[in-house]
Structure formats: structure tokens, C-alpha cells
Amino acid sequence: MESRFIKAERDTKLKLNYDAGNIISPKVHSVGVLALGSYLENHGPVLPIDTDIKIASYLALNASIKTGAKFIGTVYPATEYPYVKHGIHVSVKDLIENIVSIMKLANKYIGIDKSVIVNAHGGNLPLKKHINVIERETGMKIVMNNKIVEIEGPHAGSGETSLGYVIGIADVERMNEIDFKKYPEIGMVGLKSARKLNKKIDEGAKIVEKEGVKINPKLGRKLLNIALNDIINDIKHLIRMDKNETK
């Protein structure tokens, strides 16, 4: 699948400076980094409803800056387990269609042929089973990075709130408004169906019930660094794959 970008470069005999700038390899220009989170989801009074996509975007853009890979934007919709009621979401099928559309445009206009999807929303985890569908539809190699979801802890808990504080989206003055009855989505403490049907959600809710929600800047920075390094490793892995395929 030849992109419009590659055809234009060939037809005009234009030579782009692929080796310019602070990049890890000239081959990194064919790697896209796409942020996936959730734009419409309650996180209590301290964090905004688009917390997940802002965390994903922060990580994706910083990984792009540190490696030279191309930040190709954000995915608008998100999916969720049917028993988790704290936001507005779509089906996995609709999510896949949206991602495929973005990937095809990235290939067509800027020559992206492999991508890392940086996910910061636990409800998007079912997408992992369908990455092969996206690869088949786009002709790309796709890696889905869920590291921040794996390490941040319960929804709107201390980990995620600390992340939000570090990147500048938390309203610290509203910490005293945290109330599990008024904001049942915090730690998913008040989401009874979700707790009943998902053991991990229930375990996380119990931790938040016991320990509350606290802001720890050191923890927030640590979580961001772990996730960022993991994303960078995925980008490097895709470049190595590209080198192996061209041997």
C-alpha cells in the first residue's frame, strides 16, 4: 500500500532530511504514536471528564518528542465494559472502525506504516484482542501499550489523581469534596454492579475505601516515567522489526 506521501516524494524528487533533529533513527519517521483514552467519563471532583485521553496524549506526545516518532493525534471514542456505568462509550466495533480510519489517513498523508497505540483507559483493554483486525485492515504493524492502565491503580484513586496533578489537570482545592456517595465512580466504590461482576474492580474499590485518595507527586512522576519508558521501548521494537524485515 503506497501512501500519497511516498508517491509525492518520488514524483517531485524531493529529498527529505530523515536524519535531521534529535531522533533515535531515520526509520522512526514511519512510526506513529496514537493516544487512546476516554473523553467522556466521570472522575470525581478533582479530575476532569477527559482525564484518560489527556494522560494518554501527554505520554504519546512525550514519547514522540523523545524518539522522533510521529504523534498522530487522539482517538475520539472509547469503549467500556457494559457493567461499568460512569461515562459515555461506544462498542468495540465502532472503536476499531475509528482507529482504522485514523491509521489509513496517517499512512496516506505522512507515510506511517507502523504504530503504537498508547491507551490510558481500562475500558479499552478488550481492544487488545482485536489488534490483528486493525493490522489486517490497515496493512500496518500495531502495538497497543497499556502500561499506564496496568500500574496506575483504581479509577480516580491516588495513582491517577497523582498523575493528573503532575501533568496539571487536577483541581487540588476540591480534594475535600471527595465523597463516594456523591461521586460513586471514585475507585468505583459506589458502582455495585461493576464490583459484583469484576473481582479486580472490587479489590481496587476496597483499597480506596480503606486508604482514601491522596496526591503524591513523587508517585505521579514515577508512574509517568515507567509508562513513558515502556512506550519508547515499543517504538524501538517497531524500528528493529523494520530493520530485520529489510535485511
Swiss-Prot record:
Pathway given in the UniProt record: Cofactor biosynthesis; coenzyme F420 biosynthesis; Cofactor biosynthesis; riboflavin biosynthesis
Entry keywords, A to Z: Hydrolase, Iron, Metal-binding, Zinc
SUPFAM superfamilies in the cross-refs: Creatininase
Cofactor note as given: Requires one Fe(2+) ion for activity.
GO biological process: F420-0 metabolic process; riboflavin biosynthetic process
InterPro entries: Creatininase-like_sf (IPR024087), Creatininase/forma_Hydrolase (IPR003785), FAPy_deformylase (IPR024901)
Keyword Zinc among UniProt keywords: yes
Protein name (Swiss-Prot/TrEMBL): 2-amino-5-formylamino-6-ribosylaminopyrimidin-4(3H)-one 5'-monophosphate deformylase
Gene giving rise to this polypeptide: arfB
